[in-house]
Amino acid sequence: GDKNQITFTGRVQHLQDGSVRYDWTGVYMQTRFTGSRIAAVLSDEGTSYHNVFVDGKWIKKIKVSGKDQQTITLADKLAKGTHTLRLQKCTEGEYGCTTVKELIVDKNATLTAVKPKARFIEVIGDSYTCGFGTESNNRTDPFKLETENCNQAYGCLVANYFDADYALVAHSGQGITRHYGDSVRVVKFGQSVELCG
């Protein structure tokens, strides 16, 4: 799809073949579509988890793993009419970088980009922003990718409260001037840098 069909918010890389690649936590893609189903052709350079929202409601969390393209059904058996999809990367870029190749909808269905909101918030943070352990049942659990979910952390909660679009610039253990437990005052993010939204 093109910018008239799909909206990306956050730091992403637009590739020459039309695919879009991203690794930062919290990056999200939105589109309004007609029809009863929508699927995505995705791949990942590691492993990433994504939240799927349809018409503003959380539907499920999906896992994208491996460089081979996979077609993942995001929603199906929807009522007739126009629906809004939001696919949000909810885990950190250190563990996976996702590529969206295409969206698949019903025959004769349409895709329309979602207009940006009036407000935009950029949150710079660390593991609190990334949602480290937000889906864990025990606060002393070690890091697990499957229990990290930025959508349940303060940055996304504040943005949702104020009905704002957002971008998260966050990495567990990395600070603006110093990393956690590190005396070196240099920060280097090895992730994508193009900001969309």
Map each language-model feature to its residues.
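N-terminal secretory targeting modules
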Residues: 1-124, 128-147
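Conserved SGNH/GDSL esterase-like catalytic core that processes O-acyl groups on lipids
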Residues: 26, 93-95, 134, 139-197
